[in-house]
């Protein structure tokens, strides 16, 4: 009789232990990841629009070239060395930081930012028709 009571009590204690464990695990759900895309248009006449963009880590910035000429994007002071996802029209340069390939008219480039900070960039239009007319415009991306 004592043995049955001991087995019964052990079963109840183990059942309560597992129930407590499952209710604790249910309360620790993973935080929902929200995908954020921000678009910057590039124009040799108007520069980058918006000129300053603010967002948070995990944001994918998409640049759209609305210039007639191909453009390149280069980061100045703080370089982007780590990105989430698969960057489009970006490659890792000699210094280990991302820089863009030439983006044709109507083309896009995108980069997902994982690090916080202020990222100053310049985009250069390579004048195909008028080589002496090469232009530069600046923009800022704040990841907070």
Q: Where do the protein language model's features map onto the residues?
A:
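Bacterial N-terminal signal peptides that target proteins for export
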Residues: 1-9
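Sec-dependent signal peptide cleavage junction
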Residues: 20-29
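Short aromatic-acidic-glycine turn motif
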Residues: 79-89
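N-terminal edge beta-strand
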Residues: 28-61
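Bacterial N-terminal signal peptides
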Residues: 10-20
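Asparagine-centered strand-capping/turn motif at beta-strand->loop junctions
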Residues: 63-67
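Extracellular/periplasmic metallocenter environments
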Residues: 26, 95-144
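Short, Lys/Arg- and Gly-enriched loop/turn segments at beta-strand edges
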Residues: 69-77
């Amino acid at each position: 009789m004592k043995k049955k009571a001991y087995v019964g009590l052990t079963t109840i204690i183990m059942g309560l232990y597992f129930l407590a464990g499952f209710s604790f695990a249910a309360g620790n759900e993973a935080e929902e990841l929200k995908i954020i895309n921000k678009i910057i248009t590039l124009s040799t006449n108007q520069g980058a629009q918006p000129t300053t963009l603010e967002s948070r880590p995990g944001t994918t910035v998409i640049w759209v070239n609305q210039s007639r000429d191909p453009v390149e994007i280069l980061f100045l002071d703080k370089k982007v060395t780590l990105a989430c996802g698969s960057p489009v029209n970006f490659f890792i340069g000699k210094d280990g930081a991302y820089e863009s390939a030439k983006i044709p008219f109507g083309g896009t480039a995108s980069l997902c930012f994982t690090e916080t900070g202020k990222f100053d960039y310049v985009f250069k239009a390579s004048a195909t028709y008028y080589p002496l007319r090469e232009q530069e415009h600046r923009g800022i991306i704040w990841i907070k």
